[in-house]
């Protein structure tokens, strides 16, 4: 009698069968008005920090971090009186236009549904075809959207990181944009793997959009210096920064 056995392939073995994955960090400069807005709210956050207990007031600190992130991404999702497109939005649209011009597909991931809604409006203006999947998308519609994107000529798939960062097969895409990279590197990698997986026949280009001289760039620096921080931070979890030291938290709000 022959004993049964299970053949498993490690991820590294699978990667050998895939085309290259090219990862790019795209540093975007603030406009003059954006820089003034960002620095004003950074100063406000630092004033508030002086009144908080870093070990107890983590929810308020997380709220300040989130607001600064949103200002980096697109001030229009925070302030009704801001009318101009953000520098990061412009950079994202430029990348998308390149893919559209070359008849290639690209996915955009964001943690913020409001940002995806705004991006969708910009795509409408340029008559760029897209699908969108967020937490509001019915489960019954998810498969239909994926199948359509895999087989039709739609250029862009806008996806909420929390709603669609796992469980989707989108190998028709050759590009992935992370609009607002954050602590959770494993979540970002899983999202990238919606395109970079078995069945992918082309190189996949990954773009992380980062505002220069901002909280986003500080986060990237901390990630590089201390990769285990990425595993401590989970999006949407109010207790996600409880394991960070006060010094680590304060470094995010420094103005240098």
Question: What is each stretch, according to the model?
Answer:
Residues 44-50:
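Cytochrome P450 catalytic domain signature, combining two hallmark sequence patches
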Residues 45, 229-230, 248-249, 253:
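Generic structural signal of hydrophobic/aromatic residues within well-ordered alpha-helices
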